Amino acid sequence: MSDAIDVAIIGAGPYGLSAAAHLRDTGLSYRQFGLPMRLWRDAMPRGMYLKSQGFASNLSDPASSHTLEAFCRLTDHPYASYGLPVSLDNFINYGMWFARELAPGLEETLDRKSVV
């Protein structure tokens, strides 16, 4: 039996989570390694706001159903496509929700031995 996979996603930030969301329905086998939104949680200054507007702060999924706007509506957070700054905390929470919803197979690890 082979442990071969088609794709390995290293990282679970916005790009890695988006890649996983798109790979789910392709028929390709994949594994994803990382801690969701780790850099955003650990390295960004507390209290900061994103430079991007709400409409430009979405992670990507095939159906475009898991947008920042959808998350804010679900969690009763304020949202505007333009003109309302996106807080770091809200963006992190959005990314964590996205991971739970669309990257359920995420292997939360930083151990490089589990990847090779």
Name each model-derived stretch:
Residues L106-L110:
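Short loop/edge segments at beta-strand edges and connector loops
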Residues I92:
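Non-catalytic DNA-binding core/recognition domains of DNA-processing enzymes
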Residues K113-V116:
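Conserved small/polar residues in nucleotide/adenosyl-binding loops
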Residues F98:
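Active-site helix/loop of acyl-thioester processing domains in fatty-acid/polyketide metabolism
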Residues S2-Q32:
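N-terminal Rossmann-like FAD-binding beta1-loop-alpha1 element of flavoenzymes
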Residues S29, F33-D89:
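Glycine-rich active-site loop/strand segments that organize a redox cofactor
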